[in-house]
Amino acid sequence: MSLQSSLERLASYRAKNARASQDIFRNGLLVLQKGGFKKLGDDGWTFLEQLTLASIDVGRLDKADQCLQLLVDKFPNSPRVDCLVGIRMEATEPPEIVLKYYADILEADSANAAIWKRRISVLRRTGKVDKVVNELVQFLDTFYTDVEGWLELADIYASCNQYDHSLQALTHVLLLTPQNPFYVLQAAETAYTSEDFPLAIKMFLTVVDMTDADDSEQLLQESTPLGITVRAWFGVKLCARRIAQNANLKSLSNTSSPKNLELLDELATERLRVAYSSSGQKGEIAKGRQEVFAWVAAPLA
């Protein structure tokens, strides 16, 4: 592969923020050996950062150190380079040393979000859940709009079977990114796991509303549910059954159960039948259709 094609390929990965480490390392090594990064001007330093991360990913720490040294020499007090140095340390140093390195940086600059998140990541890998939660809560008090931080907190709570707390963290995610149906689906499934079925069915229906192409009755009957819409209809079906089995079911969020439960169950059944009756290019989902048809045909209660 020529130097020019390697440069173009690496630039494409940077533009897409892709982390194809093997290919980046292979092309980046060619550029580094031929001194091509010097021709990139200011983009050359971004290239070195890209190659550093790829080298760490593929275990070529010698090349990572070579790139890091060039960056440190050029930007001796850069917070961005400090973060790269920390990531490099994580590959070989004990967690205690890495945590101290991050703590020293945060003591000098408590607003360094990247370093703070790396520290949280290391703490989680050590299994110190209490410390991770405390650190993450402090981080989110400072950087409330960090969606990844709230998702991390929700995941930690869920891993400890604290689904109510996980759902609370996800409500902040929905406030920050209300247009993302995947986060709404995650919140719906978390509500279902915490047995708040009225809230869960409401959120599953929200996912359907967000992912349907149109609200018209005609399209609703003719369109084929795909992707997370199918998953949301499964959620509606499951919630309808659980609510029907217990008429006195209480919702921790004080969400009222839907009055038209039977109609929702019938609609979910019809939508799932359509999804699993698809053919042609969309037919992959049709695998196991007989099992699905038998399941959805079961009585509501």
Where are these regions (language model features)?
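TPR alpha-solenoid repeat register
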Residues: 47, 80-82, 114-115, 149, ...
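Eukaryotic alpha-helical solenoid repeat scaffolds
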Residues: 1-38, 44, 183-301
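Short coil turns that delineate tetratricopeptide repeat
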Residues: 75-76, 110, 144, 177-179, ...
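Canonical positions in the second alpha-helix
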Residues: 71, 104-105, 138-139, 172-173, ...
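Residue at a conserved register position within TPR or TPR-like alpha-solenoid repeats
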Residues: 52-55, 89, 123, 157, ...
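Structural motif corresponding to the intra-repeat A-B loop/turn of tetratricopeptide repeats
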Residues: 57-58, 92-93, 126, 160, ...
